[in-house]
Curated annotation (Swiss-Prot):
The name this protein goes by in its record: Methylglyoxal synthase
Assigned keywords, A-Z: Lyase
Binding site for substrate: 19, 23, 45-48, 65-66, 98
The MGS-like domain, residue ranges: 6-151
Taxonomic source organism: Aliivibrio fischeri (strain ATCC 700601 / ES114) (Vibrio fischeri)
Coiled-coil residue windows: none
Highest taxon of the lineage: Bacteria
Gene: mgsA
One GO biological process term: methylglyoxal biosynthetic process
Catalytic function, reaction form: dihydroxyacetone phosphate = methylglyoxal + phosphate
Task performed by this protein: Catalyzes the formation of methylglyoxal from dihydroxyacetone phosphate.
GO MF terms held by the record: methylglyoxal synthase activity
Length: 151
């Protein structure tokens, strides 16, 4: 597939997602990194967004709850180039009813080259990177070329 680039702005659009057993862990991480997150645009799936906003006071655009379509909404935003990175504390030891949606979300993040942190260590590296406050060019699929080849 042909590639092109897209520029992530200095003020990133960050998705925050956590499975039920990991919501307290994500909340703790967000509280620890509140200052770093304040200068960015935050999105979250429904329940997670409401908890994080209530407990931290951060402005967070809440989508639907993950099992009710929020994972798919987030995937659509990624496909549209509206999400720059994702912090997703998922539960590796328990299956969730919407596992296919979770897999689709992670697949679409990979397709569109969106950085994803899936635990505290990777989230710490991501939020601490100097690129968090800079414009960053990333390589993405050239969808126009893809369409031109297929029609």
């Amino acid at each position: 597939m042909n590639k092109t680039t897209r520029v992530m702005p200095a003020h990133k659009h960050i998705a925050l997602v956590a499975h039920d057993n990991y919501k307290p862990e994500l909340l703790r991480w967000v509280k620890e990194n509140k200052d770093a997150l304040q200068g960015h645009f935050l999105y979250a799936t429904g329940t997670t967004g409401r908890i994080l906003s209530k407990e931290t006071g951060l402005a967070i655009k809440s989508l639907l709850s993950g099992p009710m379509g929020g994972d798919q909404q987030l995937g659509a935003l990624i496909s549209e180039g509206k999400i720059d990175m994702m912090i997703f504390f998922w539960d590796p030891l328990n299956a969730v009813p919407h596992d296919p949606d979770v897999k689709a979300l992670l697949r679409i993040a990979t397709v569109w080259n969106v950085p994803v942190a899936m635990n505290r260590a990777s989230a710490k590296f991501m939020i601490s990177a100097p690129q968090m406050e800079e414009e960053v060019s990333i390589e993405i699929p050239d969808y126009d070329a893809y369409l031109a080849e297929r029609v």
